[in-house]
Amino acid sequence: MRILVIGAGAVGGYFGGRLAAAGRDVTFLVRAGRAEQLRRAGLEIFDVYGDVMVEAHTLKLLTAEELRARPETFDLILLSTKAYSLESAMADFAPAVGSGTVILPLLNGMRHLDALDRRFGAEHVVGGTTYIVADMDAEGRVHSMTGLHDVTFGERDRVVTARMKAMEATMTGAGFDVRLETDMVAAMWQKWVMLASAGAITCLMRGSIGAVMAAPGGVETARAIIAECAAIATANGHAPMEAALAEGTLRVTEAGSRLRTSMYRDMRKGARVEADQILGDLLERGRARGVEAPLLRAAYAKLSVYSASIKS
């Protein structure tokens, strides 16, 4: 299976690097500057499960300009860009989509599915989620900061197809956890509930989970935000499973936790955030079903003010 990984940042670099190190046929579609960096230094991953070095001479790299000049198609496109970069990413990898190409998006939220369906056709797009806390340093090295490193994927119509089994076989044994999910849409909603909750909690109160839990009213506020997000999912026909919701709630209300969500980390760095895709879209779907979420709305308003400030 020929795999095209879009970008070689924290998430794409981690999973693409793991796949390449395991001998899979992986090509990275990257910007010219990142290509130069990788050709010089290779791709290095620091991980609690053991560090990985993909030597520069073994890396297969393409730029968007090279792909447009000489189009070639791939069996699987692994897409893990930030949601706000989706439109430009689709334009970049469009020449790589052939009649049998599968696009596996590992983006946050759900709105990206509509955009991918419109551009390439729903038959090319499957559902996917990932749980990983990773970052990339100034030298382009990827750092995985917890033991989470899983990819879950599946068709959106609950059918286990031959192409899903082929993807499972390709990714299994590459150094991260792989799960072929039957009810993929439900799994995506489940992640969205907890991702939006954790992002809203940390960004609204500007602290790690542990710092929020230590503040007066922090636990109660966090639980109220989780309840709002779960209510929106339930109203849209995707009530979170009780066990999964309980586990997720424990994770984002853990006393002493050093967890900082990616959105909060981006906010602290003065970088762009995925507020529209993670919080705004969830609020819109809640409003359409008559569900009010005042704390989630406050978090979204705060992030909207922040986003406007970094543009000015």
Region roles according to the model:
Residues 1-51:
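NAD(P)+-binding Rossmann beta1-loop-alpha1 motif at the extreme N-terminus of oxidoreductases
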Residues 43-61, 195:
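N-terminal glycine-rich dinucleotide-binding loop that anchors FAD/FMN and/or NAD(P) in oxidoreductases
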Residues 55-141:
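Rossmann-like NAD(P)(H) cofactor-binding subdomain of soluble oxidoreductases
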Residues 95-96, 118-126, 139-242:
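Internal alpha-helical scaffold of NAD(P)-dependent oxidoreductase catalytic cores
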Residues 169, 223-312:
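NAD(P)-dependent Rossmann-like dehydrogenase/reductase catalytic/cofactor-binding core
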